[in-house]
Amino acid sequence: MNYSLIRLRFDGLAHFGTSDSALSLFTSEDHFYADTLFSALCHTALSLHGIDGLHSLLQQAADGSLLLSDSMPWHRTAHGVDYYLPKPCRTFSCLLQKQDMPQGSRKAMKKLAWIPVRSFSDFWRSIAGEASYQPQPDAFGTLAGRTQAAVSDETDAVPYQVGAYRFFPDCGLYVLIGCNEQRQLDYCAELFTVLGLSGIGGKISVGYGRFTVEEQIRLDDSDDSQLVFLQHALADASAPYQLLLTTSSPRDDELEQTMQHAQYRLIRRSGFIQSNTFNAEPFKKQTQYYLAAGATCTQRYHGDLYTVAESGNHPVYRYSKPMFLGVKA
């Protein structure tokens, strides 16, 4: 499989709902998940290429010839672009971390959500007790609340708050894509370009979540040490640890083996169906609990496209085909 990186620059506010409570409208995360991205790409494929374009994308995902990661942050510095990975879910059990690290650094370590690719090996060695790791701040933007108004013909406008995220000028998000053929990557690149015009996440009708594709890079064509590391680790299915890059869930028949020796946290995935043809009334998708990106397993699983609504005019799927990064002890 060939892997590519697509780097996105957001032009304004974005709303990436948490999907884990009734208050998700009032706050925002700093990134979006692969299932959100896949749904948005499906809508774009349908708009651009009709039902055949949609079916092509669904088939590629279903047979595993197209893989998507969650979005992850990047930060441009004087030395180039730094890419980040989700912090692995591993137990900090070594005496080196507990005794030799200042209390302030220990607290900062616990709060970390992202690890720079450049120092990922150092971080992993610190978990194994082989070295110390000094955490660095990982802010890529700021939360910003905005007041919107719900307007109807029968009542006065009702104000409500929307949580939003604004990226710093030198920051954004990137996505890793795995494809078997170049034509698949070209197709996805077209969808990303068009999707950026309408936006991703919530409240796109009022302009949230719009982005531009800043760069598309094939990992095997790059001499950037970060991307060389990613290329090798993505292909390393035999490594003793597998870092999950896609918030997803194994199939029932994969569950027992996957969860053995895994360390993870669960995240709730829900939401309403964004389709004018599925049902005349708003319809909620089936709620599922996924392994959050950053989970560490001892083997890879295949996942699936899960059917999350069955009573409408067409099937509705939730993406759950994982991408893993092989990590050596």
Question: Across the structure, where does each feature detected by a protein language model lie?
Answer:
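Conserved active-site/ligand-binding neighborhood in enzyme cores
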Residues: 1-329
